[in-house]
Amino acid sequence: MLLPTTIDGLFLRDLRMDDFDGFSSWQQDPEIARCFAFTRTPRTQDETRRVLTEIVGGAHPESVHLAIVLTGQETGEESFVGVVSLKNRHPIDLHAEFAIVIGAGAHMGKGYGKAAARRMCLYGFETLRLRKIYLNVIADNVRAVRLYEELGFRFEGRFREHFFRDGVWNDLLWYSVFPSELR
């Protein structure tokens, strides 16, 4: 699968095993890992390899995980920017959980995450026929909260002191978006 975005040279494609080095470096970066609600510590290379192997092998058909890739206009060489996902797609309720990570610091703040997130949501609504996309985010992840609100996600609730990290209890925020709300 190959999905273009609104930024020239930025597209979404299927994850591949040769993405392991970039994928692994982010999974092991403590600053990136601290933004994930699903893990408290960076993943080992073995854990990361297992996760990537499951994704590439189609072990979770209810989920779509795509690489965010920037192609050099002169060389055509790919730069692996991040991963965007629609997980736990429900076949009756027609909703899925959204997730995104921009792994390379040099690619942050350039609009790549917003373009990739919007494209993935459009794919979810138009191709997968979802009626709702939802997500959760740790409350102190201000950059992510800002992105989601800019895309039209609406705040649905707060799980107070739900997530223990770095010796502190953190709130977990829940957001969702319907097709008519996506910006």
Residue ranges and their predicted role:
Residues 1-106, 177-183:
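GNAT-family acyltransferases
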Residues 22, 97, 115, 132, ...:
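Amphipathic alpha-helical recognition patches that constitute DNA-binding helices
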Residues 104-106, 110, 139-140:
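Active-site acidic-Proline motif in GNAT/NAT acetyltransferases
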Residues 109-123, 145-150:
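Conserved acetyl-CoA-binding loop-helix of GNAT-fold acetyltransferases
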Residues 113, 117, 140-144, 161-166:
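Short glycine/proline-centered loop/turn elements that form peptide/ligand docking sites
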Residues 126-136:
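Conserved GNAT acetyl-CoA-binding A-motif
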Residues 134-137, 154-171:
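Conserved catalytic-core motifs of GNAT/GCN5-like acyltransferases
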Residues 148, 153, 175:
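Conserved active-site tyrosine of GNAT-family acetyltransferases
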